[in-house]
């Protein structure tokens, strides 16, 4: 699963996801993509599950780009532990996704296969997405 090799600080504030994606909202590598429609935190497990679903349906043909990276540590306290005594330990890594953010891109397959592969991948994500295609110039 994806996670940073090293970070400046071990733990982070929760924060809020406000506004729309400034960058990373257009197709940069592939012909087809999966674009986020709502703000949410997507964890590393979801990204990996979506990647596996997409590559499995494509039968290793074509190429997949993951445009999001889980760089936010999410902490949790163990169950049945009283409040206080400091912040919990890092449970998993997540990525804050804003609306309009391109999450996955694929190339080297036809539209029908790409649409189905990205639909299967989208089912693994906790954010509403839509299929996008590069417009022919």
From Swiss-Prot:
Keyword tRNA-binding part of the UniProt annotation: yes
Transmembrane intervals: none
GO biological process, one term: translation
Signal peptide segment: none
GO CC terms in record: cytosolic large ribosomal subunit
InterPro entries xrefs: Ribosomal_uL16 (IPR047873), Ribosomal_uL16_bact-type (IPR000114), Ribosomal_uL16_CS (IPR020798), Ribosomal_uL16_dom (IPR016180), Ribosomal_uL16_sf (IPR036920)
Alphabetically ordered keywords of this record: Ribonucleoprotein, Ribosomal protein, RNA-binding, rRNA-binding, tRNA-binding
Gene Ontology molecular function terms on file: rRNA binding; structural constituent of ribosome; tRNA binding
Gene3D superfamilies: Ribosomal protein L10e/L16
CDD domains referenced in this protein's UniProt entry, alphabetically: Ribosomal_L16_L10e
Highest taxon above the source species: Bacteria
Family the entry assigns: Belongs to the universal ribosomal protein uL16 family.
Function in brief: Binds 23S rRNA and is also seen to make contacts with the A and possibly P site tRNAs.
Record's subunit section: Part of the 50S ribosomal subunit.
UniProt xrefs under HAMAP family: Ribosomal_uL16 (MF_01342)
Protein name according to UniProt: Large ribosomal subunit protein uL16
Name of the gene this protein is made from: rplP
